[in-house]
From Swiss-Prot:
PANTHER family: NAD(P)H-QUINONE OXIDOREDUCTASE CHAIN 4, CHLOROPLASTIC, NADH-UBIQUINONE OXIDOREDUCTASE CHAIN 4. It holds the Pfam family Proton_antipo_M. This is NAD(P)H-quinone oxidoreductase chain 4, chloroplastic. GO terms for biological process: ATP synthesis coupled electron transport; electron transport coupled proton transport. The gene is ndhD. The chain crosses the membrane at residues 4-24, 37-57, 87-107, 111-131, 134-154, 167-187, 208-228, 242-262, 272-292, 305-325, 330-350, 386-406, 416-436, 462-482. Keywords: Chloroplast, Membrane, NAD, NADP, Plastid, Plastoquinone, Quinone, Thylakoid, Translocase, Transmembrane, Transmembrane helix. The keyword NAD applies. Belongs to the complex I subunit 4 family. One of its GO terms (cellular component) is chloroplast thylakoid membrane. One of its GO terms (molecular function) is ubiquinone binding. It catalyses: a plastoquinone + NADH + (n+1) H(+)(in) = a plastoquinol + NAD(+) + n H(+)(out); a plastoquinone + NADPH + (n+1) H(+)(in) = a plastoquinol + NADP(+) + n H(+)(out). InterPro entries: NADH_Q_OxRdtase_chain4 (IPR022997), NADH_Q_OxRdtase_chainM/4 (IPR010227), NADH_UbQ_OxRdtase (IPR003918), ND/Mrp_TM (IPR001750).
Length: 516
């Protein structure tokens, strides 16, 4: 166990210092904004320092572990730890939250509560990614939903309460299945609850029971990822939420579902994952094509970007189902890559709305001349969304593509068919991306009238846009920087499935053998 509680400090620091924001002057909006921004920067620096000096990349085991007895009544521990799978999402969370705080600068109504909720969400997300106890993971998962619901219901468009209610109904429904899975796994085969991830990774279950647990977790994570048909909350939520909240949703919240699939479904329930992985690949391929073909029909700019996010999540699903180290590395890289791309697109959509007060594409046009900086940034980021070579999306999707082609788990013809469907989705992506640019920036609309003048992107908006663009370019040029974080852990996860294939005939009373 680690001698110094680095992770506890990282988890608690945002919400603890954020609660002090209510002691600041009520009318001091600038003071609150700078205070929140400083907290996010300090948290990001602390996280970076901890990982740089206390984390070993070549070790696939859990590091910086902390284990404190919390509730003695049912043996509940405060267990934290990180490995190659969680370090990337944690750093992504810090980076996106810091920029989202800067993006929320124009928010003035109930600014104290708004910034506190962002910091509370920050703590919940880092807690979910660093939890090594199943019940603690569930508590952090649920805790994070409270600030998200309040951010959605109090700031945004006219239908924000409807979208927030839809979001909480979907996620609360998924949380019921998550709780059932947590209690089922924790209470199975023992008089006392077993909730430690390391212990549960060595636990064996009857096949039917493992499948039931897997389905429960899959439904919970499918809502958050989202996986069709449990995706309908996402376009409505993005369409009404404030764009800084959209940055957090697209950049971090969706990735929690993918993280849960790998952390729990793949690691703790490998036999059931072998059974369900072909279905995941089929659903992922369908999702890529469905969302990419639905996106061009969306006139609301933010809903169109939301459907593009759903399409890109299909690549993550296929990578997780590929059961290959190349495919899983591609899925993890897509988690990081789309975190930057999705956050950047929603930020630019929000800044354009701040200027023209329009969200529907059929009302726009001719914005390239009055808003050249916005036009340039959105054009570059749209290219990254359609996986232009040299940008992060290209490397991630290429790895997933090769991962499914080179997977040893599937026959040749199904792999060719899935690759063909993925290629169709890649072809459809430029259709909605380029048509969005054409409708916004080209043509002859109201913005070409001489009497109309709009302020282009200012220093704050350019800083946020460039800060999101640089990692996209950096990962596209040198993807090993991100892949090196998770490659050892991915090999350890995938090796379990090959080990299982070698000894799967050795079963006793319907239970699988020990996989690790």
């Amino acid at each position: 166990m680690n001698s110094f509680p680095w992770l506890t400090i990282i988890v608690v620091f945002p919400i603890l210092t954020g609660s002090l924001i209510f002691l600041l002057p009520h009318r001091g909006n600038k003071v609150m904004k700078w205070y929140t921004l400083c907290i996010c920067i300090l948290e990001l620096l602390l996280t970076t320092y901890t990982f740089c000096y206390h984390f070993q990349l070549d070790d696939p085991l859990t590091q910086l572990t902390e284990n404190y007895k919390w509730i003695h009544f049912f043996d509940f521990y405060w267990r934290l730890g990180i490995d190659g799978l969680s370090i990337g999402p944690i750093l992504l969370t810090g980076f996106i939250t810091t920029l989202a705080t800067l993006a929320a600068w124009p928010v003035t109504r109930d600014a104290q509560l708004f910034h506190f909720l962002m910091l509370a969400m920050y703590s919940g997300q880092i807690g979910s990614f660093s939890s090594r106890d199943l019940l603690l993971f569930f508590l952090m998962w649920e805790f994070e939903l409270i600030p998200v619901y309040l951010l959605l219901s109090m700031w945004g468009g006219k239908k924000r309460l409807y979208s927030a209610t839809k979001f909480i109904l979907y996620t609360a429904g998924g949380s019921i299945f998550l709780l059932i899975g947590v209690l089922g796994i924790g209470l199975y085969g023992s008089n006392e609850p077993t909730l430690n991830f390391e212990t549960l990774a060595n636990q064996s279950y009857p096949v039917a029971l493992e499948v039931i647990f897997y389905v429960g977790f899959l439904i919970a994570f499918a809502v958050k990822l989202p996986i069709i048909p449990l995706h309908t909350w996402l376009p409505d939520t993005h369409g009404e939420a404030h764009y800084s909240t959209c940055m957090l949703l697209a950049g971090i919240l969706l990735k929690m579902g993918a993280y849960g699939l790998v952390r729990i479904n793949m690691e703790l329930l490998p036999h059931a994952h072998c059974l369900f992985s072909p279905g995941l690949i089929i659903v992922g391929a369908i999702q890529i094509i469905y969302a990419a073909s639905t996106s061009p029909g969306q006139l609301n700019l933010k809903k169109r970007i939301a459907y593009s996010s759903i399409s890109h999540m299909g690549f993550i699903i296929i990578g997780i189902g590929s059961l290959s180290d190349t495919g899983l590395n591609g899925a993890i890289l897509q988690i990081i890559s789309h975190g930057f791309i999705g956050a950047a697109l929603f930020f630019l959509a929000g800044t354009s709305y701040d200027r023209i007060r329009l969200l529907y594409l059929d009302e726009m046009g001719g914005m390239a001349i009055p808003l050249p900086k916005l036009f340039t940034m959105l054009s570059i980021l749209s290219m990254s969304s359609l996986a232009l070579p040299g940008l992060s999306g290209f490397v991630a999707e290429l790895l997933v593509f090769f991962g499914i082609i080179t997977s040893q788990k599937y026959l040749l013809m199904p792999k060719i068919l899935i690759a063909f469907l993925m290629a169709i989705g890649m072809i459809l992506t430029p259709i909605y991306s380029l048509s969005m640019l054409r409708q916004m920036f080209y043509g002859y609309k109201l913005f070409n009238v001489p009497n109309y003048y709009f302020f282009d992107s200012g220093p704050r908006e350019l800083f946020v846009s460039i800060s999101l663009l640089l990692p996209i370019i950096g990962i596209g040029i040198y993807p090993d920087f991100v892949l090196s974080l998770s490659v050892e852990k991915v090999e350890a996860i995938i090796s379990h499935f090959f080990f299982f294939d070698s000894f799967q005939e050795k079963r006793i009373n319907g239970k699988r053998i020990l996989l690790v």
